[in-house]
């Protein structure tokens, strides 16, 4: 279906946070959205929403509510059980202290708690991680906003999961994997 008739005159689309930053800087009346991790060095001003300043602390306290989550989506069916087990291990890794620390270091806004499991405390639940998985490739794609985070997580998990390979293909939030 053609949505062009619904677009407002002057509306533009961009491919990345960097493109959005440049577009807004070059448009006196521009407004857009970027990842909060990109805001600090952008030279742009974050929008106060309902009187609350856009800070990581306020996002974590849930007082700044003009936010969006990044969601991983996975297949409902797999070509083999090994890929399913590796994805299960990856999803578990996301909830560990190590996984959360990596997400945080790549601009993710989340808390790492002492009560979060460590990878060492849960890895025995994922026997696939003890096998040689160097002949298996898992595909990642989606938003360029999380590409560095996903690449860092995949690099870590590859080392922890029998050298499984990860293929990265990012185009934007709406594209998923191409």
Where are these regions (language model features)?
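Exported/periplasmic ABC-transporter solute-binding proteins
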Residues: 1-178
């Amino acid at each position: 279906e053609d949505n062009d008739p619904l677009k407002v005159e002057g509306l533009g689309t961009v491919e990345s946070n960097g493109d959005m930053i440049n577009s807004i800087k070059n448009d006196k009346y521009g407004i857009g959205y970027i990842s909060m991790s990109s805001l600090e060095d952008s030279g742009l001003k974050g929008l106060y929403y309902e009187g609350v300043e856009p800070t990581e602390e306020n996002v974590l306290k849930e007082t700044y509510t003009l936010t969006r989550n990044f969601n991983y989506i996975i297949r409902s069916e797999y070509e083999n059980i090994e890929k399913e087990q590796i994805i299960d291990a990856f999803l578990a890794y996301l909830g560990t202290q190590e996984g959360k620390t990596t997400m945080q270091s790549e601009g993710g806004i989340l808390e790492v708690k002492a009560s979060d499991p460590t990878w060492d405390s849960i890895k025995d639940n994922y026997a696939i991680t003890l096998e040689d998985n160097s002949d298996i490739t898992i595909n990642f794609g989606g938003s360029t906003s999380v590409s560095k985070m996903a690449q860092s997580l995949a690099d870590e998990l590859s080392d922890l999961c029998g050298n499984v390979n990860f293929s990265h293909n990012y185009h934007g939030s709406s594209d998923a994997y191409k």
